[in-house]
Design a protein with these regions (language model features):
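Active-site bordering "gate/hinge" segments
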Residues: 1-297, 301-304, 313-314, 394, ...
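Dual-mode signal for accessory low-complexity, basic/Gly-rich regions
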Residues: 114, 270-443
Length: 443
């Protein structure tokens, strides 16, 4: 066993901490115990740059004294530390204002089935082997082409995690997961200047990752294709978001449909249930029980059972992303999303990105976005971008130093196609997205 505590030990600690909270005057309480360990190594130009070992554990206890809430945490699991942490949470609760929405999620909503989602796969990787993998990855990148003249390094990471959540409804559950990754970033140069790019792969099972040599070669190829970038004339063009950035585009939709933004009136999609936000040929599903996915779970951060569902169906919003607190604020019921969304799937309309390029004809393929120019309240969108100019459905040349702008509401409704090219490594399966028109500012 890699961890210092067995699942049964963490469950006992959780139950004991909740008992201490009740004995100390809490009318309700919830606690989570977590433990993690892993290692990260990085090399640059064949030399070891960093070796890091990580081992952490923590307890977070939240208590409710009537409608008053207090929270405290510790990394010490000793009896005295548990008592002190519970006391600190109780003391905080007694000094906070009452909140009608504070409290546990309804007992009837607690998960009753908790199966194995196959998310835990140990990687017994020695430090020496990790260094060798990183070197193989970097060397594959450097040997791809003589124009790859420098490296920002290659890294290998392994992470192992376990987590127990429990509350005074009597709910308690354990889950564990792993997260492994290999990455590489290199620099290429020619008479026109220098460019950098990167690539990585990650999985909860290391056997599912691409070989380090392929990751390095992909990083090099992505860097080389950016050489001799130029700008484009300012105008309105179709814009194709590569799958690597399309995930973020849909991420703004998720944020706008999240309870915190909605009850604070800081979303451009307030009161959007039953309203159209995407074209009628698109639907967005949440699938919390996918095997070997980072975001899979049978219960959320409040113990509420998760369920497969449509968030957007045929373009129409069917649900939000709500915790019990945000749901109470909105007069609704939690959707089992305390802690965030779980595995989102956007259906595709085209088989490949190449099909979307042909559909687009002439326009911009975006592969990188920069800056934080997104207003979640108004939907205004303006970001620096880099990618490729496309003519007659074929990539013509790389572009940089441009800005793309629009309103997210319009951009979502103006989607005309989605490719079936989502990356396996992503828990949100979002393919490349073609938007019919945006303002592109160049030279």
């Amino acid at each position: 066993m890699l961890f210092n505590h067995t699942p049964d030990e963490l469950l006992r600690l959780c139950g004991h901490t909740l008992d201490l909270a009740k004995q100390s005057g809490a009318t309700a309480a919830e606690a989570d115990f977590s433990e993690s360990l892993g290692q990260s190594v990085s090399v640059r130009l064949g030399e070891i740059e960093q070796i890091e070992f990580q081992q952490d554990k923590s307890l977070d206890i939240t208590v409710y004294v009537g409608q008053r809430k207090g929270r405290a945490s510790t990394a010490d699991f000793s009896e005295r530390a548990l008592q002190d942490t519970v006391k600190a949470a109780i003391d905080i609760a007694r000094y906070t204002a009452e909140d009608d929405c504070a409290g546990l999620a309804d007992a009837a909503l607690m998960a009753t089935h908790i199966g194995d989602l196959d998310r835990y796969h140990e990687w017994d990787l020695s430090t020496e082997s990790a260094i060798d993998l990183a070197k193989q990855c970097e060397q594959a990148a450097l040997s791809t082409d003589k124009r790859i003249e420098n490296s920002e390094g290659a890294s290998v990471h392994t992470g192992h995690y376990q987590y127990v959540y429990g509350n005074t409804h009597g709910f308690a559950a354990h889950q564990q997961s792993t997260h492994h990754s290999i990455s590489c970033s290199v620099v290429a140069s020619d008479e026109h200047g220098m460019q950098r790019d990167y690539w990585y792969d990650s999985s909860c099972r290391h056997e599912d990752m691409d070989a380090p040599e392929l990751i390095g070669k992909t990083a090099a190829e992505r860097t080389l294709r950016r050489l001799n970038s130029r700008s484009v004339p300012t105008s309105s063009y179709p814009v194709l978001f590569d799958t690597t950035v399309a995930v973020g585009l849909i991420g703004h939709l998720i944020g706008a449909l999240s309870g915190g933004a909605l009850y604070r009136q800081s979303s451009f999609l307030i009161d959007s249930i039953g309203k159209q936000v995407l074209p009628e040929f698109l639907s967005l599903r949440e699938e919390p029980h996918i095997l070997r996915s980072f975001r899979s779970t049978y219960f959320d951060a409040e113990g509420v059972a998760t369920q497969p569902r449509f968030v957007v169906k045929d373009g129409i919003v069917e649900g939000y992303f709500l915790s019990s607190y945000s749901a109470k604020k909105l007069g609704m019921q939690t959707t089992g999303n305390a802690g965030g969304a779980h595995n989102l799937y956007l259906n595709h309309t085209h088989a490949t990105q190449a099909d979307l390029l042909k559909e687009m004809g002439t326009g911009l393929l975006v592969t990188e976005l920069m800056g934080q120019g997104v207003n979640g309240i108004t939907g205004d969108y303006s970001r620096g971008a880099a990618g490729f100019w496309v003519e007659n459905g074929v990539i013509a040349y790389p572009v940089q130093e441009i800005t793309i702008a629009g309103r997210l509401q319009d951009m979502y409704r103006d989607i005309i196609g989605v490719a079936d090219d989502a990356l396996r490594r992503s828990s949100n399966q979002i393919g490349s997205i073609l938007v019919s028109k945006m303002t592109v500012a160049g030279n």
